[in-house]
C-alpha cells in the first residue's frame, strides 16, 4: 500500500498566511516562507499554497512568493488561486511549483483541464473541488448557468434530484448546480491527475472531514484524492484514511498554530496502522 500523505496548506492573502472559518474572518498565521521552512524541517510530504483571494478579487498570482517558497523547500509544492490560463500554469511551474490547483477556471471551461493536462501532463494538474451539501430544497435554477451547460458531452455532471453535493467557487462564495461526484469523474476523464477535495461545510470548523463526501469521491475515481476541510485532531486525520479512503489529508490551522506537529501526526497514524513516510 502506498504511504498516505500529510499535507499542510498555506492559505495566503496579501502575502501572509491566514486561516479562517469557511474562508471568512481570516486569521494571520505568519509569513509563508517561514511556514514553508518549518514544514520542510518537519518533513511534511507536500505543501499546498493557495491564494484564497485570487479568484474573488481577481488578483494576479504572487509569483515572487512562490519563487521564494520554492527556493527553500524540497518537498513537492502545489500552488493554486487565480489560475486563468495556460500561461499562468507555465509561469507557476517555472517559478518552482510542482503542481497547480485549478477550481473556478475549470468550472467556467471544463475543457481547460483537457488542454492543461495535454500540454503540461496530468501529473501536475490538480482539480480543486470545493463541495457543499444540498438537500431536496436546493433550486439549481437560482444560480446562473455556465455557457457549457447545453454541451451534451458535459450534461452528466449537472445537478440532478438525487445529487448530495454540489460545487462552489470563488472561495465558497458562489454555489453551482453541478454534481460534485460526477464532476470529479469527468475531471479525471479530462486528464486531471489528482483531486483536492474541500468540504466547504467543514472548512475551518475543526469538526472533522466530511467522511461521506470524501469516501464517495474516493470510490468514484482512480486518481488520488486529498481530503480537506475540518481537521481539528489527529483522530480526524486517521478517519480520513481509514474511513474516507483518502490518499492524503490536508490541514492548516492544527499545524499553523502548532497544536500538533507533522511528526506527531505521522507517529500517531503509524501506531494506528496507517502507512506513512517517517
Curated annotation (Swiss-Prot):
Gene Ontology CC annotations of this record: cytoplasm
Record carries keyword Lyase: yes
Enzyme Commission code: 4.3.2.10
Family matches, as Pfam families: His_biosynth (PF00977)
Subcellular localization: Cytoplasm
UniProt keyword Ubl conjugation, yes or no: no
A GO BP entry: L-histidine biosynthetic process
Catalyzed reactions: 5-[(5-phospho-1-deoxy-D-ribulos-1-ylimino)methylamino]-1-(5-phospho-beta-D-ribosyl)imidazole-4-carboxamide + L-glutamine = D-erythro-1-(imidazol-4-yl)glycerol 3-phosphate + 5-amino-1-(5-phospho-beta-D-ribosyl)imidazole-4-carboxamide + L-glutamate + H(+)
Pathway(s) served: Amino-acid biosynthesis; L-histidine biosynthesis; L-histidine from 5-phospho-alpha-D-ribose 1-diphosphate: step 5/9
Active site positions: 11, 130
Domain of life where this protein originates: Bacteria
Molecular functions per Gene Ontology: imidazoleglycerol-phosphate synthase activity; lyase activity
Keywords: Amino-acid biosynthesis, Cytoplasm, Histidine biosynthesis, Lyase
Function: IGPS catalyzes the conversion of PRFAR and glutamine to IGP, AICAR and glutamate. The HisF subunit catalyzes the cyclization activity that produces IGP and AICAR from PRFAR using the ammonia provided by the HisH subunit.
Binding partners and assembly: Heterodimer of HisH and HisF.
NCBIfam families attached to this UniProt entry: hisF (TIGR00735)
Similarity comment text for this entry: Belongs to the HisA/HisF family.
Alphabetical list of HAMAP family matching this protein: HisF (MF_01013)
Protein name as annotated: Imidazole glycerol phosphate synthase subunit HisF
Species per Swiss-Prot/TrEMBL record: Thermodesulfovibrio yellowstonii (strain ATCC 51303 / DSM 11347 / YP87)
Amino acid at each position: 500500500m502506498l504511504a498516505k500523505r500529510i499535507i499542510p496548506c498555506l492559505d495566503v492573502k496579501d502575502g501572509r498566511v491566514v486561516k479562517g472559518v469557511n474562508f471568512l474572518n481570516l486569521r494571520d498565521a505568519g509569513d509563508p516562507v517561514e511556514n514553508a521552512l518549518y514544514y520542510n524541517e518537519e518533513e511534511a510530504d507536500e505543501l499546498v499554497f493557495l491564494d484564497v483571494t485570487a479568484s474573488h478579487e481577481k488578483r494576479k498570482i504572487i509569483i515572487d512568493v512562490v519563487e521564494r517558497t520554492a527556493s527553500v523547500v524540497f518537498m513537492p509544492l502545489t500552488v493554486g488561486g487565480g489560475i486563468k490560463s495556460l500561461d499562468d500554469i507555465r509561469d507557476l511551474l517555472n517559478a518552482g511549483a510542482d503542481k497547480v490547483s485549478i477550481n473556478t477556471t475549470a468550472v467556467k471551461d471544463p475543457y481547460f483541464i483537457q488542454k492543461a493536462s495535454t500540454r503540461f501532463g496530468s501529473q501536475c494538474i490538480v482539480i480543486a473541488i470545493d463541495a457543499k451539501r444540498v438537500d431536496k430544497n436546493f433550486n439549481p435554477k437560482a444560480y446562473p448557468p455556465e455557457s457549457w451547460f447545453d454541451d451534451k458531452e458535459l450534461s452528466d455532471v449537472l445537478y440532478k434530484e438525487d445529487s448530495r453535493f454540489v460545487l462552489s467557487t470563488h472561495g465558497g462564495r458562489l454555489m453551482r448546480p453541478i454534481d460534485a461526484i460526477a464532476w470529479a469523474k469527468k475531471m479525471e476523464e479530462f486528464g486531471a491527475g489528482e483531486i483536492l477535495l474541500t468540504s466547504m461545510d467543514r472548512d475551518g470548523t475543526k469538526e472533522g472531514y466530511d467522511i461521506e463526501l470524501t469516501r464517495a469521491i474516493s470510490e468514484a475515481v482512480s486518481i488520488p484524492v486529498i481530503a480537506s476541510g475540518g481537521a481539528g485532531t489527529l483522530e480526524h486525520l486517521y478517519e480520513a484514511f481509514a474511513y474516507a479512503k483518502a490518499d492524503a489529508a490536508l490541514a492548516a490551522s492544527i499545524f499553523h498554530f502548532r497544536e500538533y506537529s507533522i511528526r506527531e501526526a505521522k507517529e500517531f497514524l503509524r501506531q494506528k496502522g496507517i502507512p506513512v513516510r517517517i
